[in-house]
């Protein structure tokens, strides 16, 4: 996922950003159950705050659980405030609702996922 941020011009050092994400993950898993994970990090290696989504063909091990739908939040380390934690909290609450999870999992396109996230997260 970090390589895609490089390709999009949102990150210059994807391996360093990835290391920041895994360091955060080592503190406490961001797996939420329901096959969802929300890795997140404030990093000096991200140029522009970004929400990235991966819908995997098969689940992967994520902490003590599995994840098949990954929503990665990356925010520039110098960004003001706690925006990423507000988005993380709002997203985690949404994921607790089966209707929201089903809408994400069954979305027909990347645009449909983006629209749903923008609406629910008030972006």
List the predicted regions and their residue ranges.
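Cytosolic covalent-transfer regions centered on His/Cys nucleophiles
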Residues: 1-123
